[in-house]
Amino acid sequence: MPGIVLRSDDNFDASYRRFKKQTDRNLIVTEARARRFHETKTEKRKKFLIASRKKMLKRLYMMRRYESRL
C-alpha cells in the first residue's frame, strides 16, 4: 500500500502529487475500478477483441504513414 512521509517543508499539493504518483505506479485505482463490478468471461473476451483490433489498426495506420514518407 502506498504511503508518503510528510516533510516539514512540503505543502499539500506536493505531498498529494507524490502520493498520486505512487498509486498510479502500483495500479491501485485501475484495479479497484476493475473489481468494482463483476465481468463475465464474455465481457472480458469482448474487451480483449476490441483492444486487439485497436492495436492492429494502430499498427496499420503507422505502417501506412511510414510508407507514405518513402
Curated annotation (Swiss-Prot):
A Pfam family recorded for this sequence: Ribosomal_S21
GO molecular function: structural constituent of ribosome
Keywords, alphabetical: Ribonucleoprotein, Ribosomal protein
Cellular component, GO, one term: ribonucleoprotein complex
GO biological process, one term: translation
Alphabetized InterPro entries for the sequence: Ribosomal_bS21, Ribosomal_bS21_sf
Superkingdom as given in the UniProt entry: Bacteria
NCBIfam families: S21p (TIGR00030)
Protein family according to the UniProt entry: Belongs to the bacterial ribosomal protein bS21 family.
Name recorded for this polypeptide: Small ribosomal subunit protein bS21
Organism listed in the record: Sulfurimonas denitrificans (strain ATCC 33889 / DSM 1251) (Thiomicrospira denitrificans (strain ATCC 33889 / DSM 1251))
